[in-house]
Swiss-Prot record:
Coiled coil: none annotated. Keywords: Amidation, Cleavage on pair of basic residues, Disulfide bond, Neurotoxin, Secreted, Signal, Toxin. It is found in: Secreted. Residues 20-49 form a propeptide. It comes from the Eukaryota. The cysteine framework is V (CC-CC). The modification Tryptophan amide is found at W62. This is Conotoxin PnMRCL-0111. The keyword Signal applies. Pfam families: Chi-conotoxin. Contains 2 disulfide bonds that can be either 'C1-C3, C2-C4' or 'C1-C4, C2-C3', since these disulfide connectivities have been observed for conotoxins with cysteine framework V (for examples, see AC P0DQQ7 and AC P81755).
Length: 63
């Protein structure tokens, strides 16, 4: 029965904790949107090269 007040206090402390990460960002903390943007840029570049290779003979980087 003595554990119940301690448990309630711990629950109140957890609930009142900040909802964000208080650690400073490092170089390794890259947002997921950055990876998504890189993927879109790569796909767009590959599609542009493919369309260029179909239309113009001297445009294709690999011949």
């Amino acid at each position: 029965m003595r554990c119940l007040p301690v448990f309630i206090v711990l629950l109140l402390l957890i609930v009142s904790a900040p909802g964000f990460d208080a650690r400073p960002k490092t170089e390794d903390d890259v947002p997921l949107s950055s990876f998504h943007d890189d993927l879109q840029r790569t796909v767009r570049t590959l599609l542009d090269i493919r369309m260029c290779c179909l239309g113009t003979s001297g445009c294709c980087p690999w011949g």
